Amino acid sequence: MKKLVSLLLVAMMALSFIPAMADEPVEIIVACKSLGNGWPAVLEDDFVYQKILEETGVAWKLILIDDYFAAMGQRIVGDDLPDVIYYSDSYLKTYADEEVLLCLDPYVEKELAPVMAWLGDTNLIPYQVNGELYGLPKLHDGNKSQYNIQIRKDWLDNLNLAVPTTIEELYNVACKFITDDPDGNGVADTYGITGGKGLPLFHAISCAFDTALGNYILIRDGKVTNALLQPGMKNALEWCLKFTQTENMVDPDVLTTTGNNIAIAGSVGIHVNSWPGMFKQYAQDNIAAVNPNAKWIPAGPLHNEMGGEDVMYPINNVGGGDGWALCADLADDEEKLQAVFKVLNYYVTEEGSNLIQYGLEGDHWVRNPETGRITMTENGAAANYISTYQIFSRIELEYLQVKFPEAEVAFTNSMTNGVLEYYNSLIVEPDGMYLADMESYIKTQMLAFIYGERPLEEYDAFIKELNDLYMFDEYMEAAADQLIAYGYDVTK
């Protein structure tokens, strides 16, 4: 009898666990190459995770994988894949070809219908492999460029100069900033121009000739071409050389260090860079601490000397590049698959979208009941880590207006500028080609031309070197074939 009672008690205890087990959330692992600054050390402090769990019943866990692509290769071999997989550049095709990704086409019209409606007219081509959709598309809501030509307006006023709009005007204003004591301290201690670390300054110059200093695949007049082959490239290099060969014109450290520090210090009056480094509140505070009268304004792009659209900077505006995809194993686990769809569809609700952009309403942000506009609270900085959750990207202009209202004049300028749109993210190089080696060689030679270490008369020889040594001509042939296959109305 005692044995029977014991068995009944065990059975009752087991039954008591069934509802709890049934209520256990479905766990989805989202693999990440990096996590946002200030990422919570424990899930209990990750309010986005907690809110998604509360609203969907899904444990949506973002995890950092060190040495990401090498580790993913090992996971593929070991059949130990996360549910949502980060990729970049050609890895989307690599993973799809290795059959580790789920084709999304069967789910577009039903399970992912809310997502597709939210994405609007976003181009799906960059997220396809062999005509099938594998990558989760990112919202395309216009130009997301951050670059502009930033100029000391108070220096222009001191010297009675206008904001430059052409390459020649930019050069002349920069010369005046060197020679005419724009800060009024009686000392010749200023440079003409600086930029973001590397080539941003020289990209702005070259964009005045409808080109940029690197391997950028372009479409011009219905044909696939490359920035290196643009008719204005030699003119662009001549102007870059003119800038570098003028004494005190170019910040000597521009290739290795961003010009933000010398711009804030008052040592230069023109800065070609992305807007956050000079227009976010912390930067404005630093500028004011050095010189309360300093006033930086955004400008550009320069007039296109080749007759086309004025463009500021080379931008991958066609999509692709990096993103997330779903593991093929989800096709065999309906519960997990539906859990993923549930979270993705929550992402594109008003509540979900606001959560992953701004944080929790009432804690990190509030909405003005009259205007409907969102503003961040004093605790808004606690939501700075959440950008990694933005799998579908974000509504950029609205986001920037909420997060950085102090910089609206700068990001409005950069986002309304024309850009040099390139298509590299869609192209897979031919077998046997080492693209990274070619691009490294291109960069060294561009710098040699810019700084007078290689004569411009050798530019045609440089292109021949790319063809002979790096399969550049075959690469361009492949680019044309692939863009045609994607459905672009272009010819070789």
Regions found by a protein language model. Name each.
Residues L9, F17, D23-K492:
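Extracytoplasmic/secretory soluble proteins
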Residues M1-V5:
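Positively charged n-region of N-terminal signal peptides that target proteins for export
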